[in-house]
Amino acid sequence: MQIIFGEKCVSLLRLFFAAVLMLWCAQTAAYSGQCHTTQGNPYIGVNFGVKTLEEEENTTGVVKDKFYQWNESNDYYVSCDCDKDNVRSGRWAFAADSPLVYLGDNWYKINDYLAAKVLLQVKGSSPTAVPFENVGTGADTRWHICDPGGQRLGGQGASGNSGSFSLKILQPFVGSVVIPPMALARLFECYNIPAGDSCTTTGTPVLVYYLSGTINSLGSCSVNAGETIEVDLGDVFAANFRVVGHKPLGARTAELAIPVRCNTGNAGLVNVNLSLTATTDPSYPQAIKTSRPGVGVVVTDSQNNIISPAGGTLPLSIPDDADSIA
């Protein structure tokens, strides 16, 4: 009887330990380690301003390494799905992707003319090209990272706050390419307990990088075949100038037909910006100064918008290798 009783006790004890082990495993597996931003600024603006390419750089396949670099100091709070009772045994890991079309070899398509390769700096690692997963860091315990309110991260040394992107020419262009703010890359963060490097691009990114800027090209275009354009404004009586900023009475508007021709080797339309540069009239800066004090010339587009003589532009879309009129 004692032996039977003992066997029952042993069996019950084994079942108890098995139940405890299963419960512990279930609790351990319940934490994904994925992190999300709880407050602060989760966006980094990669605005490179206005840059100009030389004509020889504006060639298919040309790569401009580290075309733009940034080192921001965003402050934000991150909360991770992890065990706060064992936070000291955890480790950071990162992953990144891009919503842009992937072209291979870490290149992403910005538009028909340009592609970008993005490198992000993760603490303790060399700059890593997007896309990547399972990039771990050294020990860096954050006591409140598992709390719902999150842990404050920030400063230029924080992972993801610095990086760079390289530029690749997919096909030559003429004039300017304006890149409106677009999502360039996304950084995902994990805090793994026990320590590990596992992290994938699932869930919500902790940082999103927005690209914007303008790239000018010194392309092969000619205006009026390089010849001077003369405009006859006719004769106007001095008494007809009465209101500042208005045409004199009886004055006519001279329409300009400016021949423009581009040779880029591209099929389809070419985007061109004609730029106006002249001496401005000190009393009316929107006008070009003339030899007669108090009299200026105003240039407008087809919609009667004034083109500033201080670098105002007239955008055009014209066929390549064909004569066009602006």
UniProtKB/Swiss-Prot annotation:
Part of the elfADCG fimbrial operon, which could be required for adherence to host epithelial cells. GO terms for cellular component: pilus. It holds the Pfam family Fimbrial. Residues 1-30 form the signal peptide. Belongs to the fimbrial protein family. GO terms for biological process: cell adhesion involved in single-species biofilm formation. Keywords: Fimbrium, Signal. Its main location: other. This is Uncharacterized fimbrial-like protein ElfG. Induction: Induced in the presence of epithelial cells. It is found in: Fimbrium.
